[in-house]
């Protein structure tokens, strides 16, 4: 049987000094025989998705101790992408994922912890912790802070979110009073933003990977039911420790749970629910940490056969995460996929022997368990608050309509091809990504004229100054992992195109990425990026570009000979923006850029450079 890792610092005469320090943290003689379970919390007062997590670590800790473990909590950083959006703060968002992954590794390995409970929530925190968990490969359970309630206002007949506030603010026809009303109403409670944005997408995907509990991605942050997820996570962490260290059961290790089958399940779910394109970036990065052979070609293959079963804001205004929960949450989507023969039901989870067992227990259309039905009736209270577990409102009924409800069956899918697609062509030889769930069908094939911007800042200025016209394809380049550096999100350009009435009249292509709040014909992750010699750096103003989503292609309408000539000229100039940018790049960001790969590799560090 494997020894507890913690014995390295808790056993033997030569560890007297280490034990003295452990005792100073509160440990007693009997504790040195127990597993030490790290709690990686991400509480911060900067981020609404994390502002309520201050006491969650100790809630989990008490449960761990009650069931025979020793709990030790530490914190990671957490960047709010919405607050960092639209200025140089966004340069730090994606790099923070690597910092979070490294910090979890540092803390867990430095102190020889035996297992981890990861308390995450927002955009880069869940991916960073996921990368660390798969890198460390010791027992782990994920539990997130949960989504916020959708906003409400008398000025709109649908739920509101952050993107609504941004769009009205950029719309010159909207009064200051309307903008203020949306601003005050869009984000009413603690929790991750209420739509199927990156944070909620990733928290849902941890359910499909088998590393978190049913309801993790959809139970509201404010609802009393969420407390049970934290408590159960603590109990399961102790159980997993016992199964691995006492029974030698390696099946509980994260690399065995998050197998290739699990990654295919997660991506299948992502496509079916129209998740954020950022999830592709993060799943590719996580797969590399798990040493799973899973790449953009695999995602492309899945995108061609998986239907879209769920549409949530920003892809449709009618539904938010609270509505997904009412319809049965993630295990109801997984159940529909399983019945369509699109899921590996033999994949394991940290809470059930197999995905099939979990679906049988948690899919509301399959189980008659009243407790499960009651759980998924948890709904919003409509009371602004930053307090977790502060309300216990329940819907009077579940959404069981699989023909026209929030979650559809395969037979009644929103579309027979899913909500994400990978495009290839001479402008993106290694691929680029589009969230088709947010693209109007009328522009699935679009030919337009390139309008070049060498930064997000110049693109925003150009859009607001009416330099972009109907029929243009906005090209924003040198915003990739190396070129930015940091691969900024382009939520402001896409939101401003919508506010200018160009949401269905223009496209946008970038080697940067998009917020989960983005909709429209917005194509990101162009690989290789411009700074790495990608063809997006060769496009000129006035070039024609043909986008063909059904055929998964994106083509610059320029001859191979002309592209070769342009490449020779660009090599002479160097792969950098044509116009200087007023952008200060810190030493920390330069260090990130030095090792960063393009988006098709997950924007992870280039290990070949480290190994070489």
Curated annotation (Swiss-Prot):
Catalysed conversion reaction: (2R)-2,3-dihydroxy-3-methylbutanoate = 3-methyl-2-oxobutanoate + H2O; (2R,3R)-2,3-dihydroxy-3-methylpentanoate = (S)-3-methyl-2-oxopentanoate + H2O
EC category: lyase
InterPro entries: Dihydro-acid_dehy_C, DihydroxyA_deHydtase, DiOHA_6PGluconate_deHydtase_CS, ILV_EDD_C, ILV_EDD_N, IlvD/EDD_N
Signal peptide: none
Annotated GO MF terms: 2 iron, 2 sulfur cluster binding; dihydroxy-acid dehydratase activity; magnesium ion binding
Residues at the catalytic site: 515
Pathway: Amino-acid biosynthesis; L-isoleucine biosynthesis; L-isoleucine from 2-oxobutanoate: step 3/4; Amino-acid biosynthesis; L-valine biosynthesis; L-valine from pyruvate: step 3/4
Note accompanying the cofactor annotation: Binds 1 [2Fe-2S] cluster per subunit. This cluster acts as a Lewis acid cofactor.
Gene Ontology CC: cytosol
Binding site for Mg(2+): 81, 123-124, 489
Assigned keywords, A-Z: 2Fe-2S, Amino-acid biosynthesis, Branched-chain amino acid biosynthesis, Iron, Iron-sulfur, Lyase, Magnesium, Metal-binding
Record PTM N6-carboxylysine, positions in chain: 124
Pfam families from the UniProt entry: ILV_EDD_C (PF24877), ILVD_EDD_N (PF00920)
Entry's EC annotation: 4.2.1.9
GO terms under biological process: isoleucine biosynthetic process; L-valine biosynthetic process
Cofactor(s) listed: [2Fe-2S] cluster; Mg(2+)
Quaternary structure and partners: Homodimer.
Job of this protein: Functions in the biosynthesis of branched-chain amino acids. Catalyzes the dehydration of (2R,3R)-2,3-dihydroxy-3-methylpentanoate (2,3-dihydroxy-3-methylvalerate) into 2-oxo-3-methylpentanoate (2-oxo-3-methylvalerate) and of (2R)-2,3-dihydroxy-3-methylbutanoate (2,3-dihydroxyisovalerate) into 2-oxo-3-methylbutanoate (2-oxoisovalerate), the penultimate precursor to L-isoleucine and L-valine, respectively.
Entries under HAMAP family matching the protein: IlvD
Similarity field: Belongs to the IlvD/Edd family.
Identification of the protein by name: Dihydroxy-acid dehydratase
Phylogenetic lineage: Bacteria, Pseudomonadati, Pseudomonadota, Gammaproteobacteria, Pseudomonadales
Gene name as annotated: ilvD
């Amino acid at each position: 049987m494997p020894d507890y890792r913690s014995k390295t610092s808790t056993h033997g005469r030569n560890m007297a000094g280490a034990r003295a320090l452990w005792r100073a943290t509160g440990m007693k003689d009997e504790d040195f025989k127990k597993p030490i379970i790290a709690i990686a919390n991400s509480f911060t007062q900067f981020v609404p998705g994390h502002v309520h997590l201050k006491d969650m670590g100790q809630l989990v800790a008490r449960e761990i101790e009650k069931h025979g473990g020793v709990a030790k909590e530490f914190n990671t950083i957490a960047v709010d992408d919405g607050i960092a959006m639209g200025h140089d703060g966004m340069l730090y968002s994606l790099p923070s994922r690597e910092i979070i992954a490294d910090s979890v590794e540092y803390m867990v390995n430095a102190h020889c912890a035996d297992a981890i409970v990861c308390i995450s929530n927002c955009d880069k925190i869940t991916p960073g912790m996921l990368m660390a968990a798969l890198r460390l490969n010791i027992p782990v359970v994920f539990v997130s802070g949960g989504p916020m309630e959708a906003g409400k206002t008398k000025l709109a007949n649908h739920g509101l979110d952050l993107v609504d506030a941004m769009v009205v603010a950029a719309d010159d026809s909207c009064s200051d009073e309307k903008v203020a009303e949306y601003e005050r109403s869009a984000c009413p409670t603690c929790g991750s933003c209420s739509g199927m944005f990156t944070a909620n997408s990733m928290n849902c995907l941890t359910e499909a990977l088998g590393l978190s509990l049913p309801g993790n991605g959809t139970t509201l942050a404010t609802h009393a039911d969420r407390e049970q997820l934290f408590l159960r996570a603590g109990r399961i962490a102790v159980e997993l420790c016992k199964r691995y260290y006492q029974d030698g059961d390696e099946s509980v290790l994260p690399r065995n749970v998050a197998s290739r089958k699990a990654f295919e399940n997660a991506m299948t779910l992502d496509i079916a629910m129209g998740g954020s394109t950022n999830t592709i970036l993060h799943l590719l990065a996580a797969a590399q940490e798990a040493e799973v052979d899973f790449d953009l070609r695999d995602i492309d293959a899945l995108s061609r056969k998986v239907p879209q079963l769920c549409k949530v804001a920003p892809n449709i205004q009618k539904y938010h995460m609270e509505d997904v929960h009412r319809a049965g949450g993630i295990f109801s989507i997984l159940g529909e996929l399983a019945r369509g023969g699109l899921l590996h039901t033999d994949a394991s989870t940290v809470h059930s022997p197999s995905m099939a067992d979990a679906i049988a227990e948690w899919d509301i259309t399959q189980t008659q368990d009243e407790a499960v039905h009651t759980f998924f009736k948890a709904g919003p209270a409509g009371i602004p608050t930053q307090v977790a577990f502060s309300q216990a409102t329940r819907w009077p009924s579940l959404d069981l309509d699989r023909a026209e409800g929030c979650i559809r069956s395969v037979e009644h899918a929103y579309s027979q091809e899913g909500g994400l697609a990978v495009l290839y062509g001479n402008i993106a030889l290694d691929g680029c990504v589009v969230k088709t769930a947010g693209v109007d069908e009328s522009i699935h094939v679009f030919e337009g004229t390139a309008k070049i911007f060498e930064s997000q800042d110049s693109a925003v200025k150009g859009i607001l100054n009416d330099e972009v016209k109907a029929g243009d394809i906005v090209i924003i380049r040198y915003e990739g992992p190396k070129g930015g550096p940091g691969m900024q999100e382009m939520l402001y350009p896409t939101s401003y195109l919508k506010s200018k009435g160009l949401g269905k009249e223009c496209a946008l292509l970038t080697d940067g990425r998009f917020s989960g709040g983005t909709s429209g014909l917005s194509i990101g992750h162009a690989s290789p990026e411009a700074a790495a010699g990608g063809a997006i750096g060769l496009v000129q103003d006035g070039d024609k570009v043909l986008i063909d989503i059904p055929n998964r292609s994106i083509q610059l309408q320029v001859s191979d000979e002309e592209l070769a000539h342009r490449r020779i000229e660009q090599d002479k100039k160097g792969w950098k923006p044509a116009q200087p940018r007023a952008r200060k790049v810190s030493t920390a960001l330069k260090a990130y850029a030095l090792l960063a790969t393009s988006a098709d590799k997950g924007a992870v560090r280039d290990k070949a450079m480290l190994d070489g």
